[in-house]
Amino acid sequence: MEKEYNRSPQEVLEELGSCPTGLTEAEAAERLAKHGPNKLKEAEKPSLLQRFLTQLKDPMLLILMAAAAVSAVTNALSGESFTEVFIILVVVLLNAVLGVVQESKAEAAIEALQTMTAAKCKVLRDGHQVIIESSQLVPGDVVLLEAGDAVPADGRLLESASMKIEEAALTGESVPVTKAVGLLTGDNVPLGDRKNMCYMGSTVVYGRGKAVITATGMDTEMGKIAGVLAQTEQEQTPLQRKLNELGKTMSKLVLGICVFIFIFDLVVAGEFTLDTVLSTFMVAVSLAVAAIPEGLATVVTVVLSIGVTNMSKQHAVIRRLTAVETLGCTQVICSDKTGPLTQNKMTVVEHTGPTELLATAMALCNDAALEENGAIGEPTEAALVNFAAAQGLKKPVLESRQPRCGEAPFDSGRKMMSTIHRTDNGFIQYTKGAPDEVLRRCTSYTESGQILPLTEEKRTAILAENKAMADKALRVLAAAERLYDALPDRQEPEDLEQDLCFIGLAGMIDPIRPEVKAAVAECRAAGIRPVMITGDHKDTAVAIGKELGIITDASQAVTGSALDSLTDEELDKAVEKYSVYARVQPEHKVRIVNAWRRKGAITAMTGDGVNDAPSIKSADIGVGMGITGTDVTKNVADMVLSDDNFATIVTAVEEGRRIYDNIRKAIQFLLASNMSEVLGVFFATLLGFTLLNPVHLLFINLITDCFPALALGLEKGEPDTMTRPPRDSKDGIFAGGLGFDILYQGVLITIITMTSYIIGHCMEVGYFEMPKGVSDDGMTMAFLTMSMCEIFHSFNMRSQRKSVFSLPSHNKVLWGAMIGSLALTTLVLEVPVIANAFGFTPVSWTEYGVALALAFLVLPVVELVKLIQRRAARRAK
């Protein structure tokens, strides 16, 4: 359709074959098949071949291909077989294939998470309000819009109740546009002036409305502008960036060492023949291969992917990978009360004032709907509709008697909303909201069918009733009315909400989630400060805060109005005093977050409403609500709680700590292994013998090391995961003594491996002598010992400081990886064809025993060092 803004709502509905109650499910399915999903076209994903070729550009693989080329030239000149060349190329091929597989898996995991947080919208189907994924919208669908909703597709407005839409994504104009239903004149009205239209990519910031969808997907204005939506590159976490920097630093360092070894070998050889140059180059390549932790990037990516998938199963959907690392550093969690801390299942348990009038006012000044199984909508509003129904006052019947004909929608600044209804005698306005705010606008009250002046004595009595309910941890709302002879011309809040007649109070209980008390206690044990933020009365907030264990005294609570009297400098000094904030508005949440952040605290903040987006963006970890959250808050959040539960945040923090710990374990294991290989090749070269060839080192790095490293990434959390303080976000990779551990463990494995090489060589010649050149037996023993040593060492890495024998559970995956790596190592040594290809000699039982005994030494030595480190740490305390 074109120029829908020139047509009336009825004309547009007729052209689309729709009606005000929406399409049927059958019609929607038919149109979806015709028009396709409501999605913008994405850039084509690279093919498997393109991904494979991209993997071959990896610097490590380029070095290996250069090594294969040099080896091919050397073997061709000497007339030897091309076995080594073949092995290197197979390793290159396998590594590239593994890279493609892991990249595809990681991408699939991210896509699965994106599906979980897919945008949804409220639509009328078969005359009933249902929630569907926005991608399922079709032309002719009737959607319901309210503050916080992202407009899911282009549409012609059918209703607008003071609705304002921010269309900056389309027009560049940040000022929200006030929408209306009337048709527009003129052939080419600019997009920003089409006040009876709404467009994909814009956001409802105030009011509510109803629209019929006129265009979806690439037919929308956004689709025409976008053409092709560029695919967003997956962001790297700070840890991944640090590892990339580490890789670059190591590459430069290794290049320097390689050049030194290359020149050193040539000088020692005393000749510069082609054969000498090529063989010396292969030694330098061996050193380069030894220094590069081939599996590190893969391990980190896989552990992060598995971690975020596990977190999603526990209702914490990570939208940005950076959040995984930041979670482990969290020091303050600022949480809304309703939803995260309570069950969000409101029930009216107390009320004051005339019951029938109160129930009528609460049900009509309300956007929830009554269905067969109860009310649906925002929990507080649904509770009020159910309360009215329990009095025999069903909302549809009330609406038929008193249809709505005007309104001032709720906003957090006024803390109230008002609706105007037609009656037999004229018009009546109902207002509901925070008791103190509503009461402030009242000049009279109703009692026994009479309207009486609101005296100070009565006002004090009403406030006392409000406090009595609040002290019981009830959420209290007030209702008021105002009569009109004619429909008011001006329906702005400041015009409507004055000279009101007070009706009564409704007190609702929202039960505390049973698991939250334990989660709050777990926070405190983990050195995390839980902070509750609510719009409730201070007395209600204090009662709930005490029950949850967030505060012990009312002095630890403060109101939003008190915050207004504090400067930022004063708030910075006072922020640590308060753990409960009552009567808070969205702008207060931004100030609270920023005050904690200025103190250097890593802060998480929850939010659900459209006005919460700034505070969520300001926080180190923005947490959106999956059930009650608006599209706006979900889109800016780093993490979305699919169950809106505070305990899930604590679970996510624990998982974030576990993931980071495990990545550090894998880093320590891989870098210690690479350190041993570098030192081994370097010192062996200085001593005049070849410890291991490039293919041997590749096998150890990609087979012996990679599987245990991945298994370490799946290690369960250690017993003190949630009883130690958060780590400092500024800490580097090697913080906490990790650098020292890598160094001494690398030296230890080097000594064990070189000792094994010398023993193997001496067993070959039958007497003791320092090896020179290449010793096949020595090389075989070095390979076997280093492989077993690193396999045993992976068992050490289950904990950086604790004895592995004190850990409460076993890592079955690690045991499987260790056994698998050992089996593959044995296969290489025992299958003649493979052993010959690698240049290995048969291994006797005696040699196996010697290698096993030497390799096993890594366990007791590391355990002893850990014991010394633990005692030193205790003395330091």
PLM regions: where:
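Conserved cytosolic headpiece of P-type ATPases
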Residues: 1-726, 731-734, 747, 762, ...
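Short, charged/polar, low-complexity loop and linker segments
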Residues: 769-772
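Long hydrophobic segments that form regular secondary structure
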Residues: 758, 763-764, 774
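Alpha-helical transmembrane segments of multi-pass integral membrane proteins
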Residues: 741-756
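A C-terminal functional module that forms or caps the active site or interfaces directly
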Residues: 797
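Membrane-interface starts of transmembrane alpha-helices
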Residues: 83, 774-781
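Generic alpha-helical transmembrane segments
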Residues: 704, 779-794
